[in-house]
């Protein structure tokens, strides 16, 4: 049934829709059989279709259209015959993905009058290959040729098993019918090749569209080019089908030193150099009312001369206008789609490229450009040209008509008769269109667990008296200059001498930086880095608790990489492996050794450091495995005289490390054992270490080891919101870090122990809320629970043990008891809550917190109240008043 009106078009779409639904279920084997049969039929009809196209359109050359038809069938088939376009395209068992191809549906094919049969063949074949249907809207000037090409492909496809209405066309095309087709609700994609107006209409249709832009291909010929090849290539390309290929050359820009030679070569090989009035006459005929004159499109050179009012020999290949103006006022500077060519002189290569840039920007942006140079010996020019030209195809030493369509002069450039021009040309793609653009890809993504790790320092020395033995490794490794980073107390009390005396005796030069204070600041760190830069150590030894070790780690980074910006080091990340800022490679200038003199921080084995910006008071927890020391020395002799308060705060810091590591979303079977063992040691030995001190060296040593073991656990499993809030409390109110954790940990457990939290932290291996169960496991491991206890009872016993332990170690019952004034706390609690939410530790917490929830935990901990799920501060404050009112009423 012929399609001559909208009703007939709607009927056609319905038939094609039915056919495509059937075709969508075909296998790859069936599709490939149809694809091959259709390509064979199109190739076989290449000559009659070419003759029909020239006769009907009055454009082009039969012999060249034969080549285009052959290309559209043979080259397209050869390029895509083995491409998978049906069903499962790929499977990746390692990453658990399956990619599945689905057809788009019905495609509207817009076909130009310049390439009426080859474009129809091309679009039909790639539609068949992808299980799509296609309906053509041909150009009125070449409708019969286009529709005949489509019919030949269709009949061959039907004979090979395709549904009968898989390809359709409009018999009497009009603007009305083209618009109706493009806007039809059952059209799924528009594949538009044609003039700017039609392509713009396609993109304005509200449907997905793949269109092409105008071409205005400039050619640059430099002084190193093979002139004979360059001229021959341009002539071959420009005369191909009388220049109707949109990629064909429109201008040549020749470097001055070879301009005359190029000009002469053109003149002696079929190029006609327009002179005087002839040039003006052709300029006048190229454009009509400011647009390309359709009368010259696809016409031979001698006919264009006749239109301009003069004659040239019939064997003239192209008309060449030597011009100087590079803007829209010059007709030769436009796309001409005919054997007419502008020729410009450039003073040098850079000037030639600049002119080419202007020509592209004027009318062919995104399409094609060409350079003739010595490509083997001028890679810099090839690169320069490639970077300067805003075109999707940048051809080197290649005839543009044949080269742009791909697979003829470069065999990785995809063959196509629809050439995308990217966003420059107002297109959705910037490559040669092929089957991949006509399929929808579905990705089946199976749940996969994150790759985890267990990273430690290369060496960990422990037991009493291990310090001098460990330092022997520093000596035998050949280190010559050691910088010791510590605090003034440890320096004044001879702790640093225990290191320097051993090293100096072995001939190692030493320098001591002892200005680190509690909560190290950026200014102190920078001062230490300056000393490192002047002393140039090959080993840095951090001696002390968390503060000297944290400071030393940042000094190490600044010494190794002085170009580093602290703001980038402090940037938060969701996944340490995917962070935006990558820490630089460490250990090039110096090795890092951490000697811990407190039992709690764990910093000697962790990739973490905390530093305070003294300009703002903000604490920044930094994290990266580049910060992990190369060696940790855990010598309990260094903590025998540790004061009771430091023992208590450090011990409870270690308890919190182990607790948070065990319930973290990154917890693993590797970190679990260390977290549990650390808690077991701390439960057994922390009270004795606190009360008896150096009189019980075994207890001191076990707590010292437990702190490092907990450090290993949280170095790999990370921490949670207890530390997030503790960091901010310490920064704002100068509460010792271990004390802040001790104050918060019980309410954090109450908060996390919820199997139905407001939000669960998103991490692949953490598939459901587990904190409640894991807290109960801790109670079991510590021997706190009794047979038959339910989970809730186990957690209550865990909390009771912690409260008892804190009381025994002299920990205040609330933040208020720790000395923070109520007005000061309430004035800052909102900011504390938001800053804690933004802390790096928050992301590993098993429960993803709301800022309001963190605020509630902080308020409850300030007043010494138990956190209760769903109870806000307002409710808690109202409850006593309500009870008092009720009591009065009863009385």
UniProtKB/Swiss-Prot annotation:
GO biological process terms held by the UniProt record: carbon utilization; ethanol biosynthetic process; mixed acid fermentation; protein homooligomerization; response to oxidative stress
Alcohol dehydrogenase as annotated region, ranges:
449-891
Task: Tell me the residue numbers annotated for binding NAD(+) 1.
Answer: 110-115, 195, 213, 335, 419
Q: What is its EC number?
A: 1.2.1.10, 1.1.1.1
* InterPro entries per UniProt: AAD_C, ADH_Fe/GldA, ADH_Fe_C, ADH_Fe_CS, Alcohol_dehydrogenase_Fe, Ald_DH/histidinol_DH, Ald_DH_C, Ald_DH_N
Miscellaneous information on this protein: Has previously been proposed to have pyruvate formate-lyase (PFL) deactivase activity and to catalyze the quenching of the PFL radical in an Fe(2+), NAD and CoA dependent reaction. However, it was shown later that AdhE does not catalyze the deactivation of active PFL. Inactivation of PFL is attributed to the CoA and Fe(II) present, which appear to increase the rate of deactivation.
The segment annotated Linker runs over 441-448
Any Gene Ontology CC annotation: cytosol
Identify the taxonomic lineage of the organism of origin. Answer: Bacteria, Pseudomonadati, Pseudomonadota, Gammaproteobacteria, Enterobacterales
Pfam families, alphabetized: ADH_Fe_C (PF25137), Aldedh (PF00171), Fe-ADH (PF00465)
Q: What does this protein do?
A: Under fermentative conditions, catalyzes the sequential NADH-dependent reduction of acetyl-CoA to acetaldehyde and then to ethanol. Under aerobic conditions, despite the reversibility of the two NADH-coupled reactions, wild-type E.coli cannot grow on ethanol as the sole carbon and energy source due to the down-regulation of adhE transcription and the inactivation of the enzyme by metal-catalyzed oxidation (MCO). Nevertheless, in the presence of oxygen, AdhE may act as a hydrogen peroxide scavenger and have a protective role against oxidative stress.
Taking the record's annotation, the residue ranges forming a coiled coil are none
Q: Where do the annotations place Fe cation binding?
A: 653, 657, 723, 737
The protein's name is Bifunctional aldehyde-alcohol dehydrogenase AdhE
Q: Quote the catalytic activity from the record.
A: acetaldehyde + NAD(+) + CoA = acetyl-CoA + NADH + H(+); ethanol + NAD(+) = acetaldehyde + NADH + H(+); a primary alcohol + NAD(+) = an aldehyde + NADH + H(+)
Recorded hits in PANTHER family, A to Z, give: ALCOHOL DEHYDROGENASE, HYDROXYACID-OXOACID TRANSHYDROGENASE, MITOCHONDRIAL
GO terms (molecular function) for this protein are: acetaldehyde dehydrogenase (acetylating) activity; alcohol dehydrogenase (NAD+) activity; ethanol dehydrogenase (NAD+) activity; ferrous iron binding; identical protein binding
Name the family the entry cites.
In the N-terminal section; belongs to the aldehyde dehydrogenase family. In the C-terminal section; belongs to the iron-containing alcohol dehydrogenase family.
Q: What does a knockout show?
A: Deletion mutant cannot grow aerobically in minimal media, is extremely sensitive to oxidative stress and shows morphologic defects that are associated with deficient septum formation. In addition, mutant displays increased levels of internal peroxides and increased protein carbonyl content. Both acetaldehyde dehydrogenase and alcohol dehydrogenase activities are thermolabile in temperature-sensitive mutants.
């Amino acid at each position: 049934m012929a399609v001559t009106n909208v009703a007939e078009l709607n009927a056609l779409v319905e038939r094609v829709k039915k056919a495509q639904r059937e075709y969508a279920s075909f296998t790859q084997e069936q599709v490939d059989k149809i694809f091959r049969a259709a390509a064979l039929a199109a190739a076989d009809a290449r000559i009659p279709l070419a003759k029909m196209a020239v006769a009907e359109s009055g454009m082009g050359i039969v012999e060249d259209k034969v080549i285009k038809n052959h290309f559209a069938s043979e080259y397209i088939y050869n390029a895509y015959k083995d491409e998978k376009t049906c069903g499962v395209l790929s499977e990746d068992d390692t990453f658990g993905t399956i990619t599945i191809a689905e057809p788009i549906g019905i495609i509207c094919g817009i076909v130009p009058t310049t390439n009426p049969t080859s474009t129809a063949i091309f679009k039909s074949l790639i539609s068949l290959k992808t299980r799509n249907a296609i309906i053509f809207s041909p150009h009125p000037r070449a409708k019969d040729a286009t529709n005949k090409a489509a019919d030949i492909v269709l009949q061959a496809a039907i004979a090979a098993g395709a549904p009968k209405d898989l390809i359709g066309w409009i018999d009497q095309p009009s603007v009305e019918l083209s618009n109706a087709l493009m806007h039809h609700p059952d059209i799924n994609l528009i594949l538009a090749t044609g003039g700017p107006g039609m392509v713009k209409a396609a993109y304005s249709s509200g449907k997905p569209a793949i269109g092409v832009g105008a071409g205005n291909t400039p050619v640059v010929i430099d002084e190193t080019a093979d002139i004979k090849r360059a001229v021959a290539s341009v002539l071959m390309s420009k005369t191909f089908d009388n220049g109707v290929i949109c990629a064909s050359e429109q201008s040549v820009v020749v470097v001055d030193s070879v301009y005359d030679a190029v000009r002469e070569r053109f003149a002696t090989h079929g190029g006609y150099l327009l002179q005087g009035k002839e040039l003006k006459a052709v300029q006048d005929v190229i454009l009509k009312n400011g647009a390309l004159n359709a009368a010259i499109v696809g016409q031979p050179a001698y006919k264009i001369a006749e239109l301009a009012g003069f004659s040239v020999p019939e064997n003239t290949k192209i008309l060449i206008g030597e011009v100087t103006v590079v803007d829209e006022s010059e007709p030769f500077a436009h796309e001409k789609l005919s054997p007419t060519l502008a020729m410009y002189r450039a003073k040098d290569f850079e000037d030639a490229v600049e002119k080419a840039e202007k020509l592209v920007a004027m009318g062919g942006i995104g399409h094609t450009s060409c350079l003739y140079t010595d490509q083997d010996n001028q890679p810099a020019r090839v690169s320069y040209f490639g970077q300067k030209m805003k075109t999707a195809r940048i051809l080197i030493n290649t005839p543009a008509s044949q080269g742009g369509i791909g697979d003829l002069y470069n065999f990785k450039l995809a063959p196509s008769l629809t050439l995308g021009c990217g966003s420059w040309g107002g297109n959705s793609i910037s490559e040669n269109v092929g089957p991949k653009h006509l399929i929808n890809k579905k990705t089946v993504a199976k749940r996969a667990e994150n790759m985890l790790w267990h990273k430690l320092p290369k060496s960990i020395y422990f037991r009493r008296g291990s310090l001098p033995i460990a330092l022997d490794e520093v000596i035998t490794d050949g280190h010559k200059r050691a910088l010791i980073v510590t605090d003034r107390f440890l320096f004044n009390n001879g702790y640093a001498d225990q290191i320097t005396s051993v090293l100096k005796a072995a001939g190692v030069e030493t320098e001591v930086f002892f200005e680190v204070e509690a909560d190290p600041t950026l200014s102190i760190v920078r001062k230490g880095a300056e000393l490192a830069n002047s002393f140039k150590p090959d080993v840095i030894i951090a001696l002390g608790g968390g503060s000297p070790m944290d400071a030393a780690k940042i000094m190490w980074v600044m010494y190794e990489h002085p170009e580093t910006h602290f703001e980038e080091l402090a940037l938060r990340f969701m996944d340490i492996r995917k962070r935006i800022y990558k820490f630089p490679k460490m250990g090039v200038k110096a090795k890092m050794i951490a000697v811990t003199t407190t039992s709690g921080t764990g910093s000697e084995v962790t990739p973490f450091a905390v530093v305070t910006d003294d300009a703002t008071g903000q604490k920044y927890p930094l994290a990266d495995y580049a910060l992990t020391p190369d060696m940790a020395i855990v010598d309990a002799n260094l903590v025998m005289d540790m004061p009771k308060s430091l023992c208590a705060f450090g011990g409870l810091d270690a308890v919190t490390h182990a607790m948070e590591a065990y319930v973290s979303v990154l917890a693993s079977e590797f970190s679990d054992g260390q977290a549990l063992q650390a808690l077991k040691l701390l439960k057994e030995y922390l009270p004795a270490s606190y009360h008896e001190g150096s009189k019980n060296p075994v207890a001191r040593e076990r707590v010292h080891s437990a702190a490092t073991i907990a450090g290993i656990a949280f170095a790999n499993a990370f921490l949670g919101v207890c530390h997030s809030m503790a960091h901010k409390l310490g920064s704002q109110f100068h509460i010792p870090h271990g004390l802040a954790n001790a104050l918060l940990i019980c309410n954090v457990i109450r908060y996390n122990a919820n199997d139905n939290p407001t939000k669960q932290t998103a991490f692949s291996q953490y598939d459901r809320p587990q904190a409640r169960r894991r807290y109960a496991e801790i109670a079991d491991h510590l021997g706190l629970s009794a047979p038959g206890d339910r989970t809730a009872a186990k957690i209550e016993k865990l909390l009771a043990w912690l409260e008892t332990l804190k009381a025994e170690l002299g920990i205040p019952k609330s933040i208020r008891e720790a000395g923070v004034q109520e007005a000061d706390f309430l004035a800052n609690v909102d900011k504390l809550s938001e800053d804690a939410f933004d802390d790096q530790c928050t992301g590993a917490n098993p429960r993803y917190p709301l800022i309001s929830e963190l605020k509630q935990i902080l308020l409850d901990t300030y007043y010494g109240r138990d956190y209760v799920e769903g109870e806000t501060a307002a409710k808690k404050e109202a409850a006593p008043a309500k009870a008092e009112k009720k009591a009065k009423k009863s009385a």
